[in-house]
């Protein structure tokens, strides 16, 4: 298992292909020791993740396809967070050194074609759309909405993805110019999708109520408040 994990982190496709050819079980084996943060892919890896989780987190789309062809489960939720590979693919670190939104979208589409459940919720009730919104991955949000994500789905805190779009996520780099620009794009995407600032969370709080920044409130106030 160690060899294929190293090969995935190094994006060594010939090595991954060779290892899978020698032992196809590697496509479904579970990581048994904590890996924690992996700087090469800017993502956390946990016990119970699979090689597909690792490849999806790194948006290594060619490796994702190799693993799927070898029998990897696109809906594996064997880690403690009950997150699938699509959750990891929806995550991104847009201020990171290896950020590539096109590869992220390609990875998401690859997993969806393989049967990944687009509205699967992890143990906190977060679906891939929640994750993409929280990490300010505008291209991923657009891709997931177009593919049929439920934009009104609530996590265990009661928040819809639109509510997360107008809030400070607390994520590192969220105040950077690139993150603010992505946040603006995401808000526009939800509005264009037909959601309104009057959409309520599980506690009855609207999206407009959740917005604290004046520029966000101004964006929302320019749109109809019919909850639909």
Show where each model-derived region lies.
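Eukaryotic tandem repeat interaction scaffolds
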Residues: 104, 118-157
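Ankyrin-repeat boundary/"N-cap" motif
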Residues: 1-4, 30-51, 77-95, 121-127, ...
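Amphipathic alpha-helical repeat scaffolds
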Residues: 1-9, 17, 53
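Conserved ankyrin/ankyrin-like repeat signature
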Residues: 15, 62-63, 103-107, 139-140, ...
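Ankyrin-repeat-protein effector appendages
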Residues: 1-6, 114, 147, 167-228
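Ankyrin repeat domain, specifically the short helix-to-loop turn at the C-terminus of the second helix
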Residues: 20-26, 33-34, 65-73, 109-117, ...
């Amino acid at each position: 298992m160690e060899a294929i994990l190293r090969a995935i982190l190094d994006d060594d496709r010939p090595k991954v292909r060779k290892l899978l050819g020698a032992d196809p079980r590697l496509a479904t084996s579970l990581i048994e020791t904590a890996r924690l943060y992996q700087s090469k892919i800017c993502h956390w890896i946990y016990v119970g993740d699979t090689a597909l989780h690792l490849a999806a987190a790194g948006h290594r789309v060619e490796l994702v396809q190799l693993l799927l062809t070898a029998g990897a489960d696109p809906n594996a939720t064997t880690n403690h967070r009950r997150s699938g590979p699509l959750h990891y693919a929806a995550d991104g670190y847009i201020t990171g050194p290896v950020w590539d939104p096109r590869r992220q979208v390609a990875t998401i589409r690859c997993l969806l074609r393989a049967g990944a459940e687009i509205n699967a919720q992890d143990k906190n009730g977060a679906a891939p759309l929640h994750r993409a919104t929280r990490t300010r991955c505008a291209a991923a949000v657009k891709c997931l909405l177009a593919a049929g994500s439920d934009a009104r789905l609530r996590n265990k805190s009661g928040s819809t993805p639109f509510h997360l779009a107008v809030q400070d996520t607390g994520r590192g780099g969220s105040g950077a110019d690139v993150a603010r620009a992505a946040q603006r794009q995401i808000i526009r995407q939800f509005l264009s999708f037909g959601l309104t600032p009057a959409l309520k969370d599980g506690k009855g709080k609207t999206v407009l109520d959740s917005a604290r920044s004046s520029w966000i409130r101004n964006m929302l106030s320019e749109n109809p408040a019919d909850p639909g």
